[in-house]
Curated annotation (Swiss-Prot):
CDD domains: KBL_like. This is Long chain base biosynthesis protein 2a. The lineage of its organism: Eukaryota, Viridiplantae, Streptophyta, Embryophyta, Tracheophyta. The keyword Transferase applies. It comes from Oryza sativa subsp. japonica. GO terms for molecular function: pyridoxal phosphate binding; serine C-palmitoyltransferase activity. Keywords: Acyltransferase, Endoplasmic reticulum, Lipid metabolism, Membrane, Pyridoxal phosphate, Sphingolipid metabolism, Transferase, Transmembrane, Transmembrane helix. It catalyses: L-serine + hexadecanoyl-CoA + H(+) = 3-oxosphinganine + CO2 + CoA.
Amino acid sequence: MVRLPYTTALTTLFSYGLLFAFGQLRDFFRKLIDWFKAKNVKGYAPICLGLEDFYVRRLYLRIQDCFGRPIASAPDAWFDVVERYSNDSNKTLKRTSNTTRCLNLGSYNYLGFAAADEYCTPLVIESLKKYSPSTCSVRVDGGTTKLHTELEELVARFVGKPAAILFGMGYVTNSAIIPCLVGKGGLIISDSLNHNSIVNGARGSGATVRVFQHNSPAHLEEVLREQIAGGQPRTHRPWKKIIVIVEGIYSMEGELCKLPEIIAVCKKYKAYTYLDEAHSIGAVGQSGRGVCELLGVDPADVDIMMGTFTKSFGSCGGYIAASKEIIQHLKLSCPAHIYATSMSPPAVQQVISAIKVILGEDGSNRGAQKLARIRENSNFFRSELKKMGFEVLGDNDSPVMPIMLYNPAKIPAFSRECLRQKVAVVTVAFPATPLLLARARICISASHTREDLIKALDVISRVGDLVGIKYFPAEPPKIAEADHDKLE
């Protein structure tokens, strides 16, 4: 839960007000210049209009060097960040041939599979030689290899569902699947902080969409009771079906879903549960099986389980795991399955190999070690950040930990200074977050050593003092018992 102090809120609003005022003033003079030069083609309306276009031109471009930084190596614990420069006040960024070796705190490489792996990489290279980079076809027309069917069976076994279906892109998994599950006459109840892919999927479904307060089973029950009592708009007929959509770990908050309580509410009102485990599958739980394992939930109680391969497994794509009837329905009706080229075979092999390492089926215990390390690293880093006085969102065991920045001036200051000290962080602002709630999102990996984390904490602490984002008093250092006895 964000605890935004009043003074911070006022200074943040004042900063945005100044930026808006100066932006409007610059736009006024730009219109005068364009009118005299007759620059615009007569009769054509401007393509880009509105406040979002204004935000991009007058606010985002000032700090765009803090986003989309290209890299020149695998996104391991350390990677090479390409240096860029601008000759036109940040409107255009140009790459140089120079790179900076930085500690990586931005990638979703939770288990460290994104870099070369002694077990996975040789198998991926072998699959590339055998199957080529692409099937050049859709799943229903020559695009299904032995690897695709093997991965579907393996995913179903791993998450504890009867069947699974693969997709070549994680975002599409949500945005294309949801309209196939519910349509006109149906009701979607979505967490207020669900990912944009869920939002777009719900909008495109034609179903009625209602939102409940973030991670609040009590408010979810209120919304369900109200909607069931009222029925469909205008006709007041009963809903054809109701689907409640939540995430395992919320990617911008680092919070775990209150899954047991939400499932209890859904069962009470006969609503289906749709769980997005993009950031939790493979990253949490004793054996990496996500929030169901971590929170003691039977996978059979979750009707539809979604996940991606881009985080813990070091690949690309996504999956849906559910009953055989639902999966068969999706294979025959989902455009992303019927019309899109199937997942790249080497990418499929990477996921197969990664899951086998996690399960210990590679003949080693590296998977268990990775899971223990990501849990230990995450909890250590979160605890130390809080001790320093930062406002850190999220729960224990979550590898995602946002550090609140708030003020727009602190976004580039924090990002650029960390990069200067060779720590690469991701800063997130509007429209990915509410306007007043800008943050830096730290992602921890099992590939980080304790020395890496201590270095990162040292840099972040110094930059935090410089930028002024330690919103709470730091804990005093603990005196060892022996030293305490000496003092006495």
